[in-house]
UniProtKB/Swiss-Prot annotation:
A motif (SUMO interaction motif 3) lies at residues 57-59. Its main location: cytoplasm. Residues 1-16 are annotated as: Required for ubiquitination activity. This is E3 ubiquitin-protein ligase RNF4. It catalyses: S-ubiquitinyl-[E2 ubiquitin-conjugating enzyme]-L-cysteine + [acceptor protein]-L-lysine = [E2 ubiquitin-conjugating enzyme]-L-cysteine + N(6)-ubiquitinyl-[acceptor protein]-L-lysine.
Length: 190
């Protein structure tokens, strides 16, 4: 490809090629979509996956038997009247169907029952017990297997084996990711 110089620039320059492309640009694209005609053959099956339905989608929420306990910690207000704890901030969720029995009514409350709160905080262990968050063993299992309860300098508690194994892979606390090493934790004697 030879290029000849002109006063206006090279004949086969990129700018000249761009100008010719723009001059012979594609025709305007039509704004309306044209339907494609499908030709059915004897052996082919056509499956419509567009899911265009004229009826609205209805989700039935009346038959959900699952219960979710949400623990919202609120500070008590001064001079606030003390309400009974059972149903103070609760509402009844029931079906609009009169035919269904009333024993299916569910109380929804912002307060968590004391026994559910204790189980939710530390698994199935009551509060005040020590367990390793990695292997989930309690104090008695840890001691029976010859391990120690250890605490990092950031205050997190583990069994000695789990923390040692964790520090082999990463020199950080498994809970808060603060940099620690094998010299930065100590046993706790209970």
């Amino acid at each position: 490809m030879s290029t000849r110089k002109r006063r206006g620039g090279a004949i086969n320059s990129r700018q000249a090629q761009k100008r010719t492309r723009e001059a012979t640009s594609t025709p305007e694209i039509s704004l309306e979509a044209e339907p494609i005609e499908l030709v059915e053959t004897a052996g082919d099956e056509i499956v419509d996956l567009t899911c265009e339905s004229l009826e609205p989608v209805v989700v039935d929420l009346t038959h959900n038997d699952s219960v979710v306990i949400v623990d919202e910690r609120r500070r008590p207000r001064r001079n606030a009247r003390r309400l009974p704890q059972d149903h103070a901030d609760s509402c009844v969720v029931s079906s609009d169907d009169e035919e269904l029995s009333r024993d299916r009514d569910v109380y929804v409350t912002t307060h968590t029952p004391r026994n559910a709160r204790d189980e939710g905080a530390t698994g199935l262990r009551p509060s005040g017990t020590v367990s390793c968050p990695i292997c989930m063993d309690g104090y008695s299992e840890i001691v029976q297997n010859g391990r120690l309860i250890v605490s990092t300098e950031c205050g997190h508690v583990f069994c000695s084996q789990c923390l040692r194994d964790s520090l082999k892979n990463a020199n950080t606390c498994p809970t808060c990711r603060k940099k620690i090493n094998h010299k930065r934790y100590h046993p706790i004697y209970i």
